[in-house]
Amino acid sequence: GGGNLPPLFKQKEIIYVGRLDCNQKRVLRILQTWALLEQRYPDWRLTIVGDGPDRVNLENQVFESQLENVSFEGFQNPRGYYERASILLLTSEFEGFPLVLPECMSFGVVPAVYGSYSAVYDIVEDGKNGLILPYDKKGYNAALMAEKLSVLMQSSDERQRMAENAIVTSRKYSLDSVYQSWEKLFDSLF
């Protein structure tokens, strides 16, 4: 990173922001990944922001797995969560263009995503501004994602470096930037 940003005062918190729908969003994968991390990192927590048809099932899963540092916040404006969280975990099977990525990155939240759809690779550069667990036709590997997350959870310097890069990347998706791209396109057409 450029090292020109002040240190981000982030909490040791991983968030998920989105619909609680296990079919597309695969939120259960987030809990499976967290289950491998919680005891190793007792000072970290997982916060799930959003609501949907699978909320009760997911809450039951947390209870049955005896996970303690997990909270379900329901449907909320995510801004306050973006301001304080260090990492966003997204394990969807498919997405169009996940707006949550540039949105969270603009607050210096480092995205950790499952690379199961192409838009991820347009936004996140693995090891630079976030983490990508490559798609595997055998399925999502929670243990591998937990390993990738561990590196970030252990090093505030790594988190700061990637957070700064995430902020820079997010600027490409600001309204001004998108507007200028459209303007250039139209100018080239007419």
Segment roles from a protein language model:
Residues 56-75:
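Nucleotide-activated donor-binding/catalytic signature segment of Leloir-type glycosyltransferases, i.e.
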Residues 12, 21-36, 53-59:
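A conserved mid-protein helix/loop that constitutes part of the nucleotide-sugar donor-binding site
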Residues 79, 98, 102-106, 121-122, ...:
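Short alpha-helical segment that forms part of, or immediately flanks, the ligand-binding pocket
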Residues 75-76, 81-85:
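Short alpha-helical donor nucleotide-sugar binding micro-motif in glycosyltransferases
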Residues 151, 158-172, 181-184:
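A short, well-ordered alpha-helix in the C-terminal region of glycosyltransferases
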Residues 110-114, 119, 124:
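Short hydrophobic beta-strand element within catalytic cores of glycosyltransferases
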Residues 93:
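Aromatic "clamp/platform" in nucleotide-sugar-dependent glycosyltransferases that forms part
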